[in-house]
Curated annotation (Swiss-Prot):
List of residues binding Mg(2+): S173, T193
Domain called Obg: residue spans: 1-159
Designated name of the protein: GTPase Obg
UniProt source species: Desulfosudis oleivorans (strain DSM 6200 / JCM 39069 / Hxd3) (Desulfococcus oleovorans)
Annotated TM spans: none
Gene that this sequence comes from: obg
Residue span(s) of domain OBG-type G: 160-329
Main location: cytoplasm
Gene Ontology terms: biological process: ribosome biogenesis
Job description of the protein: An essential GTPase which binds GTP, GDP and possibly (p)ppGpp with moderate affinity, with high nucleotide exchange rates and a fairly low GTP hydrolysis rate. Plays a role in control of the cell cycle, stress response, ribosome biogenesis and in those bacteria that undergo differentiation, in morphogenesis control.
InterPro entries linked: G_OBG (IPR031167), GTP-bd (IPR006073), GTP-bd_Obg/CgtA (IPR014100), GTP1-OBG_CS (IPR006074), GTP1_OBG_dom (IPR006169), GTP1_OBG_dom_sf (IPR036726), OBG_GTPase (IPR045086), P-loop_NTPase (IPR027417)
Domain of life of the organism encoding this protein: Bacteria
Region (Disordered): 63-85
Residues holding GTP: 166-173, 191-195, 213-216, 283-286, 310-312
Subunit composition and interactions: Monomer.
Length: 333
């Protein structure tokens, strides 16, 4: 399924049904009074968080959503049937914006959260309501209230505890695949990952936590180079970043270059994101020469704690998982 994280749709509630003009007509009651029933209410339009959804793919082709109208009232004081509410399901982390003004309407984050966006129109009153002592046969009724219509822009920002960042081919997708049940595309070439992936990491006796793998960034991403910064929004909600570096590709002439490039791009996108706590991880330690290059990076960067792992062989991965869990727990307190 293609990853879709933005969509613009037009939504409407249902209009209220018209009130009925009717008079009681029964044998031996030649001049029965008005008995027109009320119209039914139109259906409301709601947005609901569905935790099983991970993309806005459902809105790729369908752009119009309308709740049913209320039915008109009937004789014998029968109220018309109300229109059913229309529920639009969205993934957790969906932002709803006014398409015209850009103002944020709602941030849908809580599981099973319901947001009544457009209320259905009330049904019109039947003519039974308008009889008076001086006007006992009203031949009019109220129309139902009109529907409400709006155009909204939906934007998805994944809800993850940890975000994986790094240059292309650093091994982010491989790491995600070994620490979770996620199965992202993996290849030995840059830009294998073309959209974010989300995985749940589990530890024995502990609450699982979510990790997002973001497509690799390159220098100049904030100006649109490579895949640009379109997907960086998906780690804005994270509490922690894992900065993954390919140890085997470190340049001895400038060992800190990969680290510096990514952090510069983060700062260009969002100063707040650049200040997010980071765990620095040197990957591909199983490759020839990686150990010496990793030491050069550590010396040049002056980082006190750095994890040395091989996602391919899973060396050091369990220790990393435990450390991430401990950090997340400490940030909760």
């Amino acid at each position: 399924m293609k990853f879709i994280d933005e969509a613009t749709i037009t939504v409407s509630s249902g209009k209220g049904g018209r009130g009925c003009v009717s008079f009681r007509r029964e044998r031996f009651v030649p001049r029965g009074g008005p008995d027109g029933g009320d119209g039914g209410s139109g259906g409301s339009l709601l947005f609901r968080v569905n935790p099983s959804k991970r993309t806005l793919y459902a809105f790729r082709s369908k752009k119009q959503f309308a709740a049913p109208n209320g039915a008109p009232g009937e004789g014998r004081q029968k109220t018309g049937k109300s229109g059913d509410d229309l529920v639009i399901e969205v993934p957790p982390g969906t932002l709803i914006f006014d398409a015209d003004t850009g103002a944020i309407i709602r941030d849908m984050v809580s599981p099973e959260e319901d947001f009544v966006f457009l209320t259905g129109g009330r049904g019109g009153k039947g003519n039974k309501h308008f009889a008076t002592s001086t006007h006992q046969t009203p031949r009019f009724a109220q129309p139902g209230e009109p529907a409400q219509t709006a155009t909204v822009r939906l934007e998805l920002k994944l809800l993850a505890d940890v975000g994986l960042i790094g240059l292309p081919n650093a091994g982010k997708s491989t790491l995600l695949s070994v620490i979770s049940a996620a199965r992202p595309a993996i290849g030995a070439y840059p830009f294998t990952t073309l959209s974010p992936n989300l995985g749940m990491v589990t530890l024995a006796g502990a609450e699982p936590f979510a990790v997002a793998d973001i497509p690799g960034l390159i220098e100049g991403a904030h100006t649109g180079a490579g895949l640009g910064i379109r997907f960086l929004k998906h780690i804005e909600r994270t509490r922690l970043l894992v900065h993954l570096i390919d140890a085997s590709a470190i340049d001895p002439a400038d060992p800190v270059a990969p680290f510096r490039i990514i952090n510069a791009e983060l700062a260009m996108f969002s100063p707040a994101l650049a200040e997010r706590p980071q765990v620095v991880v040197l990957n591909k330690m199983d490759l020839t020469g990686a150990e010496a290059l990793a030491q050069q990076f550590i010396n040049a960067a002056g980082i006190k704690k750095c994890f040395l792992i091989s996602a391919a062989t899973r060396s050091g991965v369990e220790e990393l998982k435990k450390h991430l869990f401990e950090l997340l727990c400490s940030h909760d307190t």
